[in-house]
From Swiss-Prot:
GST C-terminal domain residues: 90-210
One GO MF term attached to the UniProt entry: glutathione transferase activity
Gene Ontology biological-process annotations: glutathione metabolic process; response to toxic substance
Catalytic activity: RX + glutathione = an S-substituted glutathione + a halide anion + H(+)
Protein name as annotated: Glutathione S-transferase D7
Organism superkingdom: Eukaryota
Keyword set, alphabetical order: Detoxification, Transferase
Ligand binding (glutathione): H53, T54, I55, E67, S68, R69
CDD domains assigned to the protein according to its UniProt record, in alphabetical order: GST_C_Delta_Epsilon (cd03177), GST_N_Delta_Epsilon (cd03045)
Amino acid sequence: MPNLDLYNFPMAPASRAIQMVAKALGLELNSKLINTMEGDQLKPEFVRINPQHTIPTLVDNGFVIWESRAIAVYLVEKYGKPDSPLYPNDPQKRALINQRLYFDMGTLYDALTKYFFLIFRTGKFGDQEALDKVNSAFGFLNTFLEGQDFVAGSQLTVADIVILATVSTVEWFSFDLSKFPNVERWLKNAPKVTPGWEQNLESLQQGKKFLQDLQAAKEKEVKA
């Protein structure tokens, strides 16, 4: 069994994505907590591992890689079965998966960061323009899922797992997914087809409580 250390904040979408990919591959991860809310990522011992001080960061027997989508692909390529459906060898299938991963990073996750995740730093959501970009991103995803059960072809791939980690995060907030019926259907199907989904839900609940506690603390500060 490989020695895989994952430096992560378990409730964060990117960390949850890697937890699920590892589960799909039957891999055990040594989870190393990096609490970014307390600045753990800036400690010298972590910066020596990852000078960009981002999470998640994977250390595989001395080999270091960060950026969750790169980690996901690396794990499947190294530890998955030959021509794994999670990331097939076929260039066109792989290209579509890559496109969806880049869509998540540059469009969907980016939109959520600038609207929803702003609350962790400012105590407030983003402005209307930021919300419009969230709706636009979900609209694209809804189109990708038209007439199919997965985001990049006819089977579950790393693109589904990574994007499910992103999309499921809206459960922390009051966001109506019914406007995007294909996305809603896909998310509801996730427990049936996604390895590690129970762990994802546990981490989601921890994140929701963390957010509630954070909001309560900020409200108390305002009243004081």
